[in-house]
Amino acid sequence: MNFQENLAALDLEYLWHPCSQMQEHQNFPIIPIKKAQGIYLYDFNDNAYMDLISSWWVNLFGHNNAYISQQLKNQIDNLEHVLLASFSHKPIITLSQRLCQLTGMDKCFYADNGSSCIEIALKMSYHAHFLKNQTRRKKLFLSLSNSYHGETLGALSVGDVKLYKDTYTPLLLKNLITPVPKNDSEIENSLNALKRLLDKHGEEICAFIAEPLLQCAGNMHIYSAKYLKQAVLWCKQKNIHIIFDEIATGFGRTGSMFAYEQCGIKPDFLCLSKGISGGYLPLSALLTHNEIYNQFYAPYEENKAFLHSHSYTGNALACACANATLDIFEKENVIEKNKALSEFIFSALQNALKPLIERQVVSDLRHLGMVFAFEVFLQTKERLSLAVFKKALKKGLLLRPLNNTIYLMPPYIITHEEIKKAIAGLVEAIDELKKAENK
């Protein structure tokens, strides 16, 4: 047993991995990673893997980014962490100012992961309505079908991915779900369904929560800004807060700094995480407006304070990484560069996948900014997503398909040559799985 194999065995003895059926790893070992650089991960046998999903959508500017790493080192020599109740620090003050200036919002409230950020948004929305009218509480939330907002109980309550949700249904908050349009031809029907729901329950709804334009865990479903604009307008008319979950879509992933910018809508609450620290350290931020903040601003004796906290809220090291990430956006004109890179990747995929599309092995190739996805149809002995994952790893590619959906969400620093190599390996993997169908 070599060092890599020994580590993998120790891992299985002591670790319980997220979103995993651990029994599968008895025959398919965990891969311990020794180091990473750029888009590559390296195991202890020096095998390299292209990180084509940005390590669960968090890594924007490559692993071991020289600038972010240096800013982290600078910060760790001064302050690693301090409680955020009654204390503060320069990195979080700077970050809060920058985020508010970027979004036109007024206040930031911090946590350390996306699900917690959603929980804060739900609580804050409910609490704000409660403070405005204590005798008539709004008790429901509204979300879109096929949505995903995290895996804590509140976040699961407003999601609609059954794989994560069904087991815990008896524990969840009551929530209303309205159909997201599957394509532009369904916009009118989806809006009509929403109108009926709002006519019946509008006065009971605290907030409408949505992932603007792109439902990532919902098989990378892209939907129309036209639908979202009208949905938000009707909700606002009913005094329903708007929560935009940009945990996965924020920081340039959809082609603009934030996806909601493409809709001409500003939410009451904006949830950010994942790419906020460049993939270095856990951090999330909920942004809101003074209109909300001022409802909680009162003498202590009035019991209006928003009493929510996490031990590592606003960690100084994470905030230093987040500021470094924003520096890169500012200095390197990332959004404009990504537009050209996005078109190059999509064109390369169109050309490479054309034979597979003609053979009806692949369909529905789509993209939004730096997100690329398509459906694949294969008969495999094990579930399709696992078969693709394993085959891709043999090609040196890290993918994590969602059911039949293969997607790419690479770091923004990926080069044209790396793209060509990755797509060639991806096509080879699909071809080999197709050829193995009848064996």
UniProtKB/Swiss-Prot annotation:
Pathway listed: Cofactor biosynthesis; biotin biosynthesis; 7,8-diaminononanoate from 8-amino-7-oxononanoate (SAM route): step 1/1
Cofactor(s) annotated in UniProt: pyridoxal 5'-phosphate
PTM-bearing positions, type N6-(pyridoxal phosphate)lysine: K274
Complex formation: Homodimer.
PROSITE patterns in alphabetical order: AA_TRANSFER_CLASS_3
Enzyme nomenclature, EC number: 2.6.1.62
GO CC annotations, alphabetized: cytoplasm
Keyword Plastid tagged: no
Reactions catalysed: (8S)-8-amino-7-oxononanoate + S-adenosyl-L-methionine = S-adenosyl-4-methylsulfanyl-2-oxobutanoate + (7R,8S)-7,8-diammoniononanoate
Name this protein carries in UniProt: Adenosylmethionine-8-amino-7-oxononanoate aminotransferase
One Gene Ontology MF term: adenosylmethionine-8-amino-7-oxononanoate transaminase activity
General function of this protein: Catalyzes the transfer of the alpha-amino group from S-adenosyl-L-methionine (SAM) to 7-keto-8-aminopelargonic acid (KAPA) to form 7,8-diaminopelargonic acid (DAPA). It is the only aminotransferase known to utilize SAM as an amino donor.
Cell compartment(s), UniProt: Cytoplasm
InterPro entries attached to this UniProt entry: Aminotrans_3, Aminotrans_3_PPA_site, BioA, PyrdxlP-dep_Trfase, PyrdxlP-dep_Trfase_major, PyrdxlP-dep_Trfase_small
Disulfide bonds: none
Main location: cytoplasm
Family listed: Belongs to the class-III pyridoxal-phosphate-dependent aminotransferase family. BioA subfamily.
HAMAP family assigned to the protein according to its UniProt record, in alphabetical order: BioA
Organism, scientific name: Helicobacter pylori (strain J99 / ATCC 700824) (Campylobacter pylori J99)
Residues the UniProt record annotates as site (Participates in the substrate recognition with KAPA and in a stacking interaction with the adenine ring of SAM): C19
GO BP, sorted A to Z: biotin biosynthetic process
Sites where the protein binds pyridoxal 5'-phosphate: G114, S115, D245
Pfam families: Aminotran_3
Residues at which substrate binds: W56, Y148, K274, S309, R400
Keywords: Aminotransferase, Biotin biosynthesis, Cytoplasm, Pyridoxal phosphate, S-adenosyl-L-methionine, Transferase
